[in-house]
Amino acid sequence: MKKQVSLLTLTAALLLGACSTYEEVPATSGDGATAVGFLADIAPREQSRADINVDFGTGLTGTWNGEDKLGVLANDFSKLLQFTYTTDSKAFTGSLFGSAGTWAYRAFYPHNGNATVSGTTVTVPFSALRTQNGNKYNSEFDIMAADAITHNNAKPGKTPEGNAVKFNLHRITSILALKLQGGAASEKIASVMLTSKKPIASEKLTFTVPSDPNATYDPSAITPKLVVEGTSAMGSPISINSEHITVTYADGTAPSADYSETFFNVLPDDSYGDLTFSACTDKGNAASFTITRTTPVVANWVYTVERTAPFTKAAAPTVEWIGHEDLTTPTELLESGNSADIRVSAPGGIKSMQVDITSSVLTTPMEGSEQNLLEAVKLAPSMELTNPANNDMAAALAGFGFPTPAQLLNQQHVYFQIGGLIDMLAMVCAEVTETTNSDFKFTVTDNAGQKTVITLKYVKTVVSPITYNNDADLWANTASFTLNIPADATSVSVQYRIKGQTTWN
């Protein structure tokens, strides 16, 4: 195959559907449930995923496997069911409740337990962080929707003729397939990142599942969309989409840097423009190149890129506190809505990330307790984010918006928001009687051992309501003071007393 230098090429993957045979599954006893086995084939030019391969010449090949799970809605479209592929029966098996009559079905793939349905809208994960097993394709984000089906006078899971219901699935995404060479055989690929100028991933993706059994499949009616905003554990809005997709590897499966195959499921787009592929090794060496795609990327198609690129020592990590160019002057704490958005770029892959907190209000034991506030919420003054001290700390860190170890290790780009923790700091500082400083120092180390440090500085300034101007005149028997009057004050009075006396004047 001709090597592609500047353009993604379209591989017409002319694939045969996975023609499954069906064996009757005995019904479970009790509960009124009927054991059902659904069949599922893929529309032409797609393949029945799971065990799937791209040979960069003929396209996709593969079969369903025992890890594949189908999301099914049957009559009660508010109840999402999960059917798991069984290799013995070559069908997706599960249970339906009901008797013979009219049965209407909707289905999608995959349903790994995190999907939800509201009406005809399905929400599934479409994460920026993905894992491959070596050079094998990962089917977790290969989203498909089935044509709607309705059968009258039929038993659950059957056609009127008594055959198993078969879903015809349509792939919603496009597949970008990268074959990369040029690194040292002695090094392992730590991660491969795809970067676009527009969002290409999100914690949540929504699409419309077909609902009219008489309608021809219309890709434009599926309307897949990336969800832009979510809510943090502290209740504040956070961004959940990303312009990056990063692939890392299951333990012990990372391919050698001299040859790797990486796959990215993305949504169709009329013109992605610049697409950058960046790879790094476990030794901190990196390779990167950009291609330009100005023609449409279409659902159901595989687009392949083959490249030999030099791997050289990566640039040191950079850490950015977004919106804060001056890191020497502390930022005044607000009552709420404090911003703490952090962007980390590590071309060599992150090996470790530590945060050190210096704050008297967070680290001093609370009144009537031996614990300080950090300890009370399962945190500590010094924490290794890539290896939290215990499960409680790991859960607490995630709750406050810190990235998890999986979101850090070998990643080349990390974005996180910890404004909720800073809002908690502001709540505590509302009670202080003197100016208080709090520092959050982040230390990022990449796979090459290069370190970058950044400190987020916050201050709660407490202004005295009355300040002596240090201008006493003993001869004139006078002195002056400056009052700091709140803007919402309705009346102001000043009292004084002579030293040694108890009466205020």
Description of each model-found segment:
Residues Y109, A279-T281, V444-D446:
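Conserved structural position at the C-terminal beta-strand
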Residues T436-N447:
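A short beta-strand micro-motif common to beta-rich folds, especially ectodomain repeats
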Residues P160, N168, K179-A257:
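Short helix-loop boundary/capping segments
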Residues E23-K188, T248-Y249, A257, S278, ...:
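Short, low-hydrophobicity acidic/polar segments
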Residues R497-N505:
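Recognizes extended acidic, P/S/T-rich segments that occur
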Residues K451-K460:
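C-terminal edge beta-strand
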Residues L16-A18:
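C-terminal motif of bacterial Sec signal peptides marking the signal peptidase cleavage site
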Residues Y22-Y85, W301-E375, L379-A380, V462-A489:
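Acidic/polar, low-complexity intrinsically disordered N-terminal segments immediately downstream
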